[in-house]
Amino acid sequence: MAKLALIEREKKRARLVAKFAAKRDALKAIVEDQSKSEEERYEARLELQQLPRNANPTRQRNRCAITGRPRGTFRKFGLARNKIREIAFRGEIPGLTKASW
């Protein structure tokens, strides 16, 4: 089980990403727009740098919903590989069976 502080930190990052998503997208559009003047693009770049670091979606880490484990997490289930294995063996994931050939 991951420390509760690490799980809460990820939740805080998710809230920041959601809060600043629209502003971030607007500023990135200005920075990438070649028809804007260099001064406007420069100002937008500076303003983009002033946003909180954790507002960047690439800083988020997928974690297991049960254990908080940061590695080996399947996006489809939102669970770590070992928890998927446990739940699948109990037959609680519909359509998921152990491979055999």
Curated annotation (Swiss-Prot):
Transmembrane segments: none annotated. It comes from Burkholderia lata (strain ATCC 17760 / DSM 23089 / LMG 22485 / NCIMB 9086 / R18194 / 383). PANTHER family: 30S RIBOSOMAL PROTEIN S14 (PTHR19836), SMALL RIBOSOMAL SUBUNIT PROTEIN US14M (PTHR19836:SF19). It comes from the Bacteria. Keywords: Ribonucleoprotein, Ribosomal protein, RNA-binding, rRNA-binding. Binds 16S rRNA, required for the assembly of 30S particles and may also be responsible for determining the conformation of the 16S rRNA at the A site. Part of the 30S ribosomal subunit. Contacts proteins S3 and S10. This is Small ribosomal subunit protein uS14. GO terms for biological process: translation. One of its GO terms (cellular component) is cytoplasm. The keyword Ribonucleoprotein applies. NCBIfam families: PRK08881.1.
